[in-house]
Amino acid sequence: MKSVNHLVLTPGSLSLAQLREISRHKLTLELAPEAINDINISAQIVQKVLDEGRTVYGINTGFGLLANTKIAPEDLQLLQRSIVLSHAAGTGQYMQDATVRLMMVLKINSLSRGFSGIRLEVINFLISLVNAEVYPCVPEKGSVGASGDLAPLAHMCLPLLGEGEMSYQGQIISAAEGLEIAGLKPIDLAAKEGLALLNGTQASTALALEGLFHAEDLFAASSVIGAMSVEAAMGSRSPFDPRIHAARGQKGQIDSAMVFRYLLGEESEISLSHANCEKVQDPYSLRCQPQVLGACLTQIRQAAEVLATEANGVTDNPLVFQDTGDIISGGNFHAEPVAMAADNLAIAIAELGAIAERRIALLIDSSLSKLPPFLVKNGGVNSGFMIAQVTAAALASENKTYAHPASVDSLPTSANQEDHVSMATFAARRLRDMSENTRGVLAIELLAAAQGLDFRAPLTPSKAVAQAKAELREVVAYYDKDRYFAPDIEAATDLLYTASFNAYLPLGVLPSL
């Protein structure tokens, strides 16, 4: 990358760090010059098929169950237009511009590999839309994640035909207006181009990548806030001893324990104050954090590997092979790897919230934490964090339902030609809602743990924990008596949305950071 906001794309080489940037920041894009030759050769192979009068699926045939129907040469251009229009059958709210931007870059990356038989001018059209920050309006629902994300990608490609709606600077405009802003005119798609644009897993992958980056942020926040709860509850540092975790050998657990040691430091005034207490063991929500968060970290890392591969792969069909000139039909559009990665991320996100909710319950329970009941003075007159914990329980419980695997829920489509599908798009899309729920739980724990630390004063926590608490206190004051609670949760949630707690972790723990 030349800078944060300009990317010279060498097809097939996007890093997770670059993908995170693309998902969260606007950028300008240009294609590396060395990619152009592969694109042109691939398109020439498709043209050769037409010149020789051969019949090849996806070039001069129908699609799906109609694959055996040969299309007359004079109808090929109409075929490409028709497939885009007919497949733009999505429903629901529009995806966020950032999601569409990431999806477009993923599609550009795939098409530019030279396996798709698509002309350079079509790829440059998509690049121009990204650079002009004019994004197609893409409904969230309508893909089952096999034969690609057909409906979402069709909506993404409508502007090439001058059809559909677009988003520009927060406003919904017509495709005609959007193309004028970008300095473009509609183009006629050539043979295979409509299918190449629509086939692929880019919608599912974009949504899953966003879920991955949220999961990374939540892991970092869980670690920082979990360490704060250890200090607030006067928990032991012994469970983070590296010898314990080395004996088991689980890499995620070992690294999570290392993060807790990094955050808690050697000792603090709080930890020294109870070094010789009679308590033998802490509850699991404190003591087993490396085991639980470490397992989540393992799932995050595995999903990251799958999604980084998918982001750089070619997932349309059929594929053009330049070395032999062969055009071969396969099934790379089937998004099962994305669906399973998203399912695993869903479990990790749910568990980060579930154990955080238990730590909140621990902190407000005076018999366990030795803090004032519900973390407030003058209990009875004040209810303190009583209902905030109920809110956390509601959010954590909702995620349990969301965490049901989507990849096992297949329905046949296209008259049973497409008889097993991945449901990757929903598997990935729900990660946003799950992340919002877990972020809400962590925001409440952050408020509770900071409140607990205030009750421990003048004893001080570790340096990192004190710094994190200070960040919160810049936006939320100490809870001295009952007040309107929702704004406090909102402010703490907004703080977590900044992902500032990512900086508290050592480099290399999370895949994209």
Swiss-Prot record:
Record-linked InterPro entries: Aromatic_Lyase (IPR001106), Fumarase/histidase_N (IPR024083), HutH (IPR005921), L-Aspartase-like (IPR008948), Phe/His_NH3-lyase_AS (IPR022313)
Localization of this protein: Cytoplasm
EC code: 4.3.1.3
Pathway: Amino-acid degradation; L-histidine degradation into L-glutamate; N-formimidoyl-L-glutamate from L-histidine: step 1/3
Keywords of the record: Cytoplasm, Histidine metabolism, Lyase
GO-annotated biological processes: L-histidine catabolic process; L-histidine catabolic process to glutamate and formamide; L-histidine catabolic process to glutamate and formate
Species whose genome carries this gene: Shewanella oneidensis (strain ATCC 700550 / JCM 31522 / CIP 106686 / LMG 19005 / NCIMB 14063 / MR-1)
Main localization of the protein described in the UniProt heading: cytoplasm
Molecular function via GO: histidine ammonia-lyase activity
Domain of life: Bacteria
Modified how: Contains an active site 4-methylidene-imidazol-5-one (MIO), which is formed autocatalytically by cyclization and dehydration of residues Ala-Ser-Gly.
Pfam families: Lyase_aromatic (PF00221)
Reactions the enzyme catalyzes: L-histidine = trans-urocanate + NH4(+)
Modified residues (2,3-didehydroalanine (Ser)): S147
Record location of the 5-imidazolinone (Ala-Gly) cross-link: A146-G148
Protein name (Swiss-Prot/TrEMBL): Histidine ammonia-lyase
Broad enzyme group: lyase
